[in-house]
Amino acid sequence: MIQKLKAKGFTYNATLDMLEGEFNGQPVRVTVVTDNNKVYRICLIDENNCSESQIKIRFNTLCRQFENNKKYLPMKDNQEISESEDISYEMLVHKKEYQAGFYQIGPEGTTSFLDKSLEELEQISKKVVWFTIGDHYGQYYIIMYYDNYNNQANGEDL
């Protein structure tokens, strides 16, 4: 997976022990998490922080991009943040977390999704992408995860 990311232009930063590059038009840092040489998580972290109003726009734009992509199915309806939401207050005072999640249903999209068996639907639920807002001293950034629970440790080494 790391070689595939390098082929897409990502470069290794030895100081951070992460890959760096551009994803969806934004500079990001990437970590790849494996278990028994199988990738079960790819984590992308925005390299640049932004203001509260900018992060709302970025978060909502990502929600719309995933909702409009036939390869993904939203985990719940309307995951966008309202314009009136005071993110800084909610995160600081109420420890609120802003997250959006989508199932990866494959290149065939939702049309054949309805024809899937229960077993196939269970497999779809094990491949998700989700993102959240991180905070660093009043500046915000997106952390995005691509998870494949099929490759995650489930206690088999215990």
Feature locations, PLM:
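Non-cytosolic coordination micro-motifs
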Residues: 2-12, 48-158
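A generic structural signal for beta-strand entry/edge sites
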Residues: 16-18, 37-39, 137-141
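Mid-chain, structured segments of secreted extracytoplasmic proteins
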Residues: 23-65
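Start-of-domain marker
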Residues: 1-27
